[in-house]
């Protein structure tokens, strides 16, 4: 039964794509502004860092069920998320500076 539901989901996606290709409007979900998406991404980065810190604290306190490899994986994920956020910021600053240096 789950396979049928999965197939129905794929079929509905294909139908939505076909309607979009014909130029007809579909019931679209509300889109988030750029600032909203940026804020949500920063919140996800912050949440990931908080989760990694909490995992590390639990491991340090010796709570059962917290393995070192899980802590290290969470900390690495938080680090990669932060590096990605920094790179996005750098690209945004570079794009802003380029636009500001254009002559009108």
From Swiss-Prot:
GO annotation, biological process: bacterial-type flagellum-dependent cell motility
Key word Transport present: no
One Gene Ontology term of the molecular function aspect: cytoskeletal motor activity
Keywords: Bacterial flagellum
Domain of life: Bacteria
Main localization, broad class: other
Name of the protein in its database record: Flagellar hook-basal body complex protein FliE
Organism listed in the record: Salmonella arizonae (strain ATCC BAA-731 / CDC346-86 / RSK2980)
């Amino acid at each position: 039964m789950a396979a049928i539901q999965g197939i129905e989901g794929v079929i509905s996606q294909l139908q939505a794509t076909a309607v979009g290709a014909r130029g007809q409007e579909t019931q679209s979900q509300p889109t988030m502004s750029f600032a909203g998406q940026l804020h949500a991404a920063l919140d996800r980065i912050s949440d990931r860092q908080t989760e990694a810190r909490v995992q590390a604290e639990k491991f340090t306190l010796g709570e059962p069920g917290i393995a070192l490899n899980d802590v290290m994986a969470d900390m690495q994920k938080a680090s990669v998320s932060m590096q990605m956020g920094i790179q996005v910021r750098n690209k945004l600053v570079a794009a802003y500076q380029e636009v500001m240096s254009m002559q009108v």
